Amino acid sequence: MKEELLKRFTKYVKVDTQSNEESKACPTTPGQMELANILVTELKEIGMQEVTVDEFGYVMATLPSNTTKEVPVIGFLAHLDTATDLTGKNVQPQVHENYDGKDIVLNKDLNVVLSPKQFPELADYNGKTLITTDGTTLLGADDKAGITEIMVAMNYLINHPEIKHGKIRVAFTPDEEIGRGPERFDVEAFGAKYAYTMDGGPLGELEYESFNAAGAKITFNGNSVHPGTAKNKMVNAVKMAMEFNAHIPKDEAPEYTEGYEGFYHLISLNGDVEQAKAYYIIRDFDHLKFVERKTHIASIAKELEEKYGEGSVELKLNDQYYNMREKIEPVKEIVDIVSAAMRNLDIEPKISPIRGGTDGAQLSYKGLPTPNIFGGGENFHGKFEYVALESMVKATEVIIEVARLFEEKE
């Protein structure tokens, strides 16, 4: 199993599937369709049935039931795209066998070092096989580890018919990282009663709560005048943006929050005297606090527009997804069965809220309750991203055990 996981994973991460928020297409980048087509071929090769990919890059396939019992159809999902935070082009995965607990030099020329001083959780991986970047790209374990684990689990079940299971559906979706994954996902065609995203982090993670999420695009329209004659005429759009940000509570940012604490996050700010643009994301687990955060953003925009004149501040505020706990708690047994599967494999479940989002958050609101299971990766979205091969083995085994337990309990 280890060899197959390593071979598939290192193949998939070399396909550049970074999504693009500026694109209106679906998928937003051609690399995602390239990987989708690769997976379609491989799904057919291992013996999956009803293998399809649509024009938008959604891959679906079926592993038929091998039991006479009436077992609910379950699904496993992972996303094709990688994050926009750092390039996913020319990923060169590095394999470090029998990790010794010391610094790992990712890139000598650029002096990029993965160090337990900065990332103390590395101590958990002594003796393990780590797959890292070369220090110039992200790795793409988010979520190609999940894709790999689903592929290997399905191949294992096909080759081990003694493990009884109901009908299993798998899906690989585009553009999750920019919040569009479920937009064109056909829940009815997928046909599962419950599903799981393999999109979590370290070993044991199990999540069924997510942020409520919104995005705020703000355009500041200034007035550029020659600085020599600018008195009482110039309006500096960049300074307007800075003034806007000064109204955001500085301790309510990602770098100062954890657990159930929400935040405002300034993703980007660019512009000049004439015009500046800022993009914030707004996150909170509590719906009332989420609404209050959006109201605060809107009130700052209104206040500044009143100060600088009509049309000086333009705000576009849109909800992205909601906390999936509301949709999963009524069917909490689907979380409990994963906890049982993990314990059967000597994994201690670590149930915590997702300080982020998965396709499962939106899918749960489309009628498909979808908790999130660990994929094994650490330090997602950056050059220090890595995954332990042994964690990928465990995630694969969890998929297999969940399928077995669903059949056993009927």
Swiss-Prot record:
Chemical reaction(s) catalysed = Release of the N-terminal residue from a tripeptide
Q: Name one Pfam family in it.
A: Peptidase_M20
Example GO biological process: peptide catabolic process
Q: Where does Zn(2+) 2 bind?
A: 142, 177, 381
* Any one Gene Ontology molecular-function term assigned to this protein's record: zinc ion binding
Q: Which residue windows are coiled coil?
A: none
Active site feature: 81, 176
Cofactor: binding comment: Binds 2 Zn(2+) ions per subunit.
Q: EC top class, in one word?
A: hydrolase
Q: What is its main location?
A: cytoplasm
Which keywords appear in this protein's UniProt record, sorted alphabetically?
Aminopeptidase, Cytoplasm, Hydrolase, Metal-binding, Metalloprotease, Protease, Zinc
Q: Which GO terms describe its cellular component?
A: cytosol
Instruction: Give the UniProt subcellular location, in the record's own words.
Output: Cytoplasm
Q: Which cysteines are joined by disulfide bonds?
A: none
User: What cofactor does its activity depend on?
Assistant: Zn(2+)
Identify the CDD domains for this entry: M20_peptT (cd03892)
Keyword Secreted attributed: no
Which residues bind Zn(2+) 1 per the record? Answer: 79, 142, 199
Enzyme Commission (EC) number = 3.4.11.4
State the function annotated in the UniProt record.
Cleaves the N-terminal amino acid of tripeptides.
Q: Which family does it belong to?
A: Belongs to the peptidase M20B family.
What name goes with this protein? Peptidase T
Q: What is the lineage of its organism?
A: Bacteria, Bacillati, Bacillota, Bacilli, Bacillales
